[in-house]
Amino acid sequence: MQRTLSIIKPDAVKKNVVGKIIDRFESNGLRIAAAKKVKLSKCDAKAFYAVHSERPFFNDLVEFMTSGPVVVMVLEGENAVAKNRELMGATNPKEAAAGTIRADFAESIDANAVHGSDSLENAINEINFFFAAREIC
């Protein structure tokens, strides 16, 4: 059993599609082991996305991720990292396959509805960023 981190981003929270996105995960074999709604501070967003700090989009990403609440979740299941990424679809919703979360709920490459860990190693680090072990069950 594998775990991964998912973030439902401010655009999707604002559009009130959190339940629809969670349903996609659950109906495709991923179980929610932990979840909470949080408002990221700029400091939190910069730390979480530090890997992108030298990229030209970094400041816009931080601004976007702090523009409203997000829902962070630990998803659990067989090949959870790959399954979550498959369900999310391509980063750019215009390139995302029909029926994926981003194709159905995202507006743009920036406001793309969801974040998901891109590797098992990053999943562990990202989960630990948001959750204490006692919060995951």
Swiss-Prot record:
Active-site annotation: 115 (pros-phosphohistidine intermediate)
Catalytically driven reaction(s): a 2'-deoxyribonucleoside 5'-diphosphate + ATP = a 2'-deoxyribonucleoside 5'-triphosphate + ADP; a ribonucleoside 5'-diphosphate + ATP = a ribonucleoside 5'-triphosphate + ADP
Record EC number: 2.7.4.6
UniProt-annotated location(s): Cytoplasm
SMART domains per record: NDK
Needed cofactors: Mg(2+)
Matching InterPro entries: NDK-like_dom, NDK-like_dom_sf, Nucleoside_diP_kinase, Nucleoside_diP_kinase_AS
Residues holding ATP: 9, 57, 85, 91, 102, 112
CDD domains in the record: NDPk_I (cd04413)
GO cellular component terms listed in the entry, alphabetical order: cytoplasm
GO MF entry, a single one: nucleoside diphosphate kinase activity
Function summary: Major role in the synthesis of nucleoside triphosphates other than ATP. The ATP gamma phosphate is transferred to the NDP beta phosphate via a ping-pong mechanism, using a phosphorylated active-site intermediate.
Family: Belongs to the NDK family.
Protein name (Swiss-Prot/TrEMBL): Nucleoside diphosphate kinase
Organism, scientific name: Campylobacter curvus (strain 525.92)
Lineage: Bacteria, Pseudomonadati, Campylobacterota, Epsilonproteobacteria, Campylobacterales
Gene expressing this chain: ndk
